[in-house]
Amino acid sequence: MIGRQHAGDEAVSSAWSRACNDLIKRVIDLYPANFIGVCQLPQSPGVPISNSAAELERCVRELGFVGCNLSPDPSGGHWTSAPLTDRSWYPFYEKMAELDVPAMIHVSSSCNANFHATGAHYINADTTAFMQFIEGDLFKDFPTLRFIIPHGGGAVPYHWGRYRGLADMLKRPPLPEHVMKNVYFDTCVYHQPGIDLLFKVIDIDNILFGSEMVGAVRGIDPETGHYFDDTKRYVDQADISDADRRKVFEWNARRVFPRLDAVLKKMGK
């Protein structure tokens, strides 16, 4: 996937991913106390995900990256790929498990005019991925896999009762044991009530701090006078304990990204 255009074939996507990941590595080398890498994958519509395993391994073993971004829909809104629980994804999951790295589930741009990228496609993908995990048995086969679903988990926290009920109707185990040992949400939610709901519904151990500043939604909220995407402020103001806040800001990430934890320990942190 190239930027927002989805241009090029498998060879172009592979070259572009390598170039982007190498650029990330340059930034890390310039600011090693501030950044660590998570890699882009050379996913293309119709190309087996197993072809991305080599770039993941290169980034982790050679560049020192600690995870990857995984798109459940390389087609850009047409959903031509199999569900994330399908065995066609397993070769890549085997590499994730071997390297002990998590993946953030995140689509690229929308190539479907029905779905605005930021306002619809992203949230659709977050929610769809979670439902796929409910329907499948992926974590029985890969009990150590870890996925982060961004944007507060899409629509999931707001409809938590729906998903609990669907799991029951589909004769799936309860969500805490079936999905939530392996799936985490971030805090990229752009208003205080949304963050408050996330903390009320989802266990604190499943929430990682996330920020999209200089990212998806710019501008100052006229109701607060602060930037919409200043997500740290929402976490700071949430009615949670200092210990839980520390989990969100640091400890949960160190647990989900063990290679990050190892780097920080080497720094004496």
Annotate the PLM regions:
Residues 5-11, 110-126, 163-182, 227-232:
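Active-site gating loops and adjacent loop-to-helix segments of metal-dependent hydrolytic enzymes
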Residues 32-33, 64, 91, 140-144, ...:
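Proline-centered flexible-loop/turn and helix-kink motifs
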Residues 36-39, 68-70, 103-105, 147-149, ...:
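Hydrophobic faces of well-ordered beta-strands that scaffold small-molecule active sites
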Residues 63-66, 98-102, 118, 142-145, ...:
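Glycine-enriched alpha-helix->loop->beta-strand junction motifs that scaffold or abut catalytic
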Residues 75, 109-111, 153-157, 191:
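Short, catalytically relevant binding-site loops at active-site mouths
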Residues 134-180:
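Aromatic-lined glycan-binding groove of carbohydrate-active enzymes
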